[in-house]
Amino acid sequence: MRMAENYRFRPPYPTEVYTTLLELMREHPRIILDAGCGTGKITLGLIDHIDRADAVDTSDAMLRVARASPAAASSKIRWIHGSIEDAPLDPPYGLIVAASSIHWMDLDRTLPRFADALAEGAMLAVLDGDAPVDAPWEREETAFMIDFIAAQEGQRPNWWKTIRERFAEPVLMHPLFERRGHRITAPFSFSQSIADYLRCQHSRSAWSEDQLGAKASVEFDAEMTTILKRYARDGMLTFDVQTRIEWGRVRRS
């Protein structure tokens, strides 16, 4: 799946993400469950500072990319192919992390399972955001993307939100989740070529080449390149990246 291969073009999470997650584990076992781990950014970023990680994802393609990292061979990591609702777990966990994955889960099944798997007093942390924040081209890009979806699907998307709009709302709202805090990381500057920026876009489900098909992917890239060239310097785009982290306790019922 090309979507998984394009994940390497996403910006890294800020260091503040990892320090925050480690703070949340301070009084608990240094064992994490990375739920919907994708290509393993959270697990691989924490593994030198924890005792063990179970990293679960439904996509074999994502896990293949994760396992290709040199750090992925650590005996402290168990890569598990399966759904978080049914995958074999090895609790208790000092922290469960769902990084840009909670929206894919059946929460009525998953949250009670998390409650059972967490050590006493341990937290669930959910993350959102590894995309440009307040980029100079955001207005043009957004208008194009909304029109592109409307042309593809026959109607304008009612789910569309900018990163700022998403940051203003909780990532997870569910009766079984008791939010205890949140943090929006400080912005950090990231640069990449237009070609790599487009590959990053193709790592997102709405814009994946598997979703769009070959013809629409070429059209998408051509229009986006026209927009982005106006903002690039020597072919490079520079933008800020931020992440919203929120954490809380999970009840079984």
Q: What role is predicted for each listed range?
A:
Residues P88-I96:
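A short acidic, Gly/Pro-enriched loop at the edge of an enzyme's catalytic core
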Residues R26, I47-D51, D106, A119:
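Short conserved AdoMet
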Residues A115, A119-F190:
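Conserved catalytic/acceptor-binding region of the Class I
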Residues I163-S253:
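Conserved Class I S-adenosyl-L-methionine
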Residues A98-A99, L107:
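A short beta-strand submotif of the Rossmann-like class I SAM-dependent methyltransferase core
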Residues M105-F114:
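A short, conserved alpha-helix within the catalytic core of class I
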Residues I31-L33, T39-D86:
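Class I SAM-dependent methyltransferase SAM/SAH-binding core
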Residues M1-E27:
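Conserved class I S-adenosyl-L-methionine
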